[in-house]
Swiss-Prot record:
The keyword Cytoplasm applies. InterPro entries: Exonuc_VII_L (IPR003753), Exonuc_VII_lsu_C (IPR020579), OB-fold_nuc-bd_dom (IPR025824). GO terms for cellular component: cytoplasm; exodeoxyribonuclease VII complex. It comes from Koribacter versatilis (strain Ellin345). Pfam families: Exonuc_VII_L, tRNA_anti_2. Heterooligomer composed of large and small subunits. The keyword Iron does not apply. It catalyses: Exonucleolytic cleavage in either 5'- to 3'- or 3'- to 5'-direction to yield nucleoside 5'-phosphates. The gene is xseA. Coiled coil: none annotated. This is Exodeoxyribonuclease 7 large subunit. Its EC number is 3.1.11.6.
Length: 455
């Protein structure tokens, strides 16, 4: 008999609900997701692990507790910075339970740094990364052509920026050909559109220099020009790129990776096209340099000829040397006159072209004249270089002939000229007798001797 029967009472067994592990975890997960569907959590990143799938896994911790965080690829790719251990952040998402391990976690949809903004952190991170790869190195910078005939500009086709660039280019050199690649300079598609412009000019447009331009703005406004893809497009460009983004105080990743940074779009136009005065000054400087180099070379040959002419071993060769020296002087004079005429003609053609620009606004006609003038300038420069080379070769050949005729060159090989006491050149041992005094002329110095026995 049971205890309850002895007392005369009947006890019913308590009702028990027995859960399967899967069911209880699922129920708790659902309750958590209902109650904590949209929460903000701050903490320090630890155990950061990006997966090959693009998902991000890490923990947020404070002084005593950790919370697992997962951010799926669709949200992770929208981040403007790269999460890393030790970075304090604020995460937004829903609390859930990872059923496989019964582990509490936050499924993050948004992440931002505490303190400094995400864009600034992304800027510093990308700057450090590209600098470590050497993309900012000075030796990578390509020179900007002095007088480009064709310029590519990547910017918005509307607004003050493109007008400022065109106005400066027209004022400094109206014949330059400008191609504009229209691109958004702000917004989600801006970076890819600007990068497409850089690639287009490298493949199809045959331009000599590219200007990437945008007006000033906040770091958010200039975010497209801090894009890694755009930076690498500029770095791999075979055509020199000038970055003209923002105001003078604004710096972007494009500024660091470009071949030249201009403080403003207008300044970029001034840097890429020299004024007529600058061209004249450059031509004058080149003319002076060529003339100075020619004078130095001619002076060297004149000194060498004078030294050879004064040497006692030459004797009757002074007349031949004088004739050759006169020929050298004549060549030098004719070369100087030709050089002066070439540069005078070049300056005159540039003056005529400049006058036509000031009095006519026939852009197509002037462009043709500019192309013709440029071709003639190149032809004149090539002719001048060829003339200089031809004259220099001829002078060197004359000097070589003189050197070959010089007895000094023979003496320097170990031979000697022997003279008797009267200074007559001895060619036969029978010209002297025992006891006669003779003098041997060497390459450096003389030796006197007494004949012991002629043979």
């Amino acid at each position: 008999m049971s205890f309850s029967d002895q007392l005369g009472f009947t006890f019913s067994a308590p009702q028990r609900r027995i859960w399967q592990v899967r069911d209880i975890v699922s129920a708790v997960r659902a309750a958590l997701e209902r109650e904590y569907a949209d929460v903000w959590v701050e903490g320090e990143i630890s155990n950061f692990r990006p997966a090959d799938s693009g998902h991000l896994y890490f923990s947020l911790k404070d002084e005593s507790t950790q919370l697992r965080i997962v951010m799926f690829r669709s949200q992770a790719r929208l981040l403007k910075f790269r999460p890393e251990n030790g970075l304090k952040v604020i995460a937004r998402g829903k609390v859930t339970l990872y059923e496989g391990r019964g582990e509490l976690q936050l499924m993050a949809e948004y992440l931002e740094p505490q303190g400094a903004g995400a864009l600034q952190i992304a800027f510093e991170q990308l700057k450090a990364k590209l600098q470590a790869e050497g993309l900012f190195a000075r030796e990578r910078k390509k020179p900007i052509p002095a007088l480009p005939k064709k310029i590519g500009v990547v910017t918005s086709p509307r607004g003050a920026v493109i007008q400022d660039i065109l106005n400066v280019l027209r004022r400094r050199h109206n014949s330059v050909h400008v191609l504009i690649f229209p691109a958004q300079v702000q917004g989600e598609t801006a970076a890819s559109e600007v990068a497409s412009g850089v690639r287009y000019f490298n493949k199809a447009a045959n331009v000599e220099v590219i200007i990437v331009a945008r007006g000033g703005g906040s770091i958010e406004d200039l975010a497209a020009f801090n894009d890694e893809g755009l930076a690498r497009s500029i770095a791999t460009s075979t055509i020199p790129v000038i970055s003209a983004v923002g105001h003078e105080t604004d710096f972007t990743i494009c500024d660091f990776v470009a071949d030249l940074r201009a403080p403003t779009p207008s300044a970029a136009a001034e840097l890429v096209i020299r004024s007529k005065q600058e061209v004249d000054e450059r031509l004058t400087a080149l003319s002076t340099h060529l003339a100075r180099a020619l004078r130095v070379r001619l002076l060297e040959y004149e000194k060498k000829l004078d030294r050879l002419a004064r040497h006692g071993a030459f004797g009757g060769m002074q007349t031949a040397i004088a004739r050759r020296q006169q020929r050298v002087d004549d060549l030098a004079f004719r070369l100087s006159v030709a050089q002066t005429n070439v540069f005078r003609q070049l300056h005159r053609r540039l003056d005529v072209a400049s006058t036509r620009v000031r009095h006519h606004d026939l852009r197509s006609r002037f462009a043709a004249e500019h192309r013709e003038l440029s071709a003639r300038v190149e032809k004149l420069a090539a002719t001048l270089r060829a003339n200089l080379m031809r004259r220099r070769t001829r002078i060197e050949r004359l000097a070589g002939q003189l050197q070959g005729l010089s007895p000094i060159s023979i003496l320097e090989r170990g031979y000697a000229l022997v003279f008797d006491a009267e200074g007559r050149l001895l060619k036969d041992a029978r010209q002297v007798r025992e006891g006669n005094t003779i003098r041997a002329q060497l390459a450096l110095g003389q030796i006197s001797a007494v004949v012991k026995k002629p043979e």
